């Protein structure tokens, strides 16, 4: 079996700094795809960049959280009460979504984000999930992907001792939904206060040197260094390092 590698930039549309990094990386030939956060304030700019630069291969980064302290966003669906915190935004943490959100609202919100991206008239082929908020609803998510013709970020090499994961992988394979074989650890593993560019560079190079046979995906969170990014994201150094 041959080795294949997908390098994806998550969080397209999150902020202007992320958008500029994604555009530059595509133009430099450094990434293969990106996934767009439709509910974020800079999603319209990201969509415009896709029209201006057709080389950008985009998917949807299905989002149900707004993790930053002072930079928030909320549901696109008008029927998503269980996804909103007391201020009307998405919850900060995945744990709160898993505890509070019901399946119907999660699916409605995913569909609303898909519909928004379609209205931008941007071709897109794949979905993935911001902060794993769909981890308890994988079969429902895959059924939707099957109906709509999307692939989904789910790795066959994940720990299949979790019944939902094993069932989801089997469902994808049985129904012809394209998934990957391996999802490689990325810069999320590096705490901001202990991060160095050399540490993540060496980690990526080591993973590339030992890439397994099959389809692997690296997902990154690149952003251009800016005052905007520093004001938004405590992990800004890691994001700049990904860029």
Identify the residue ranges that each predicted region occupies.
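DG-centered beta-turn motif at the end of beta-strands
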Residues: 9-12
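Gly/Ser/Thr-rich loops at beta-strand to alpha-helix junctions
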Residues: 131-135
């Amino acid at each position: 079996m041959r080795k294949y590698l997908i390098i994806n930039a998550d969080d397209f549309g999150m902020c202007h700094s992320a958008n500029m990094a994604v555009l530059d990386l595509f133009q430099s030939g450094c990434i293969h795809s990106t996934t767009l956060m439709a509910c974020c304030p800079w999603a319209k700019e990201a969509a415009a960049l896709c029209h201006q630069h057709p080389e950008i291969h985009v998917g949807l980064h299905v989002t149900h959280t707004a993790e930053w302290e002072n930079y928030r966003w909320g549901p696109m669906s008008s029927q998503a009460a269980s996804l909103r915190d007391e201020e009307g935004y998405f919850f900060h943490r995945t744990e709160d979504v898993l505890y509070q959100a019901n399946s119907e609202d999660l699916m409605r919100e995913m569909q609303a984000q898909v519909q928004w991206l379609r209205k931008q008239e941007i071709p897109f082929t794949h979905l993935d999930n911001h902060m794993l908020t769909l981890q308890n609803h994988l079969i429902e998510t895959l059924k939707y992907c099957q109906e709509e013709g999307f692939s989904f970020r789910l790795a066959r090499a994940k720990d299949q001792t979790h019944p939902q994961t094993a069932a989801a992988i089997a469902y994808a394979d049985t129904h012809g939904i394209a998934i990957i074989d391996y999802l490689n650890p990325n810069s999320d593993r590096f705490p901001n206060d202990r991060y160095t560019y050399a540490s993540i560079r060496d980690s990526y190079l080591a993973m590339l040197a030992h890439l397994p046979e099959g389809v692997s995906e690296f997902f990154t969170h690149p952003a251009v260094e800016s005052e905007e990014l520093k004001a938004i994201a405590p992990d800004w150094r890691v994001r700049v390092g990904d860029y």
